[in-house]
């Protein structure tokens, strides 16, 4: 519940228990691997799927799926999604929203690379959004920025992500896991003169060793659509903040 409190207090998104995104980590393909690691950009990679808290610390990572798997397929096969679908992820019970009578599920915020489901919220399509939809998409995108920020800090702190990693993929997995653990440690440990401090930087567009997930058409569930509409109504009514319309 501490994660949800963080998103509510810092990013004005109640009942949010994380922000999810993924990156292709570029590698040099092993001999005789063929197109096994070949991704949508024509390079070779493994995928890092991660969830962050409101402070841009990683609270879940899944790394190692080969880049050939579609990005939707990576989410489908990752352990977190499988536990959510099976009801074994330990999701909190639905909770009443602040200053409201609406009882809604806890959710993870995502972007267009992910499906819309009861516990996975994504923005509305960018085409022909009305004001209420734009407000929802803005509020969600603010909260989701935390995971982009986490990736940006990770990539800028560890230069191993600045080019394709020329090691066996099993070793790359261990390196990525170690870097995410060190990222969390350095985010929470007292700064010392021997530890370089890296400013928050959510820009991963110019990191040569990382690629974003490919946006592809994802199926929306009926429950996901209903929950998103209820959050939209909340953000435009009792959950509105005075400055939100300036950004829509």
Predicted regions and their residues:
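Short, polybasic Lys/Arg-rich linear motifs in disordered N-terminal/cytosolic regions
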Residues: 1-248
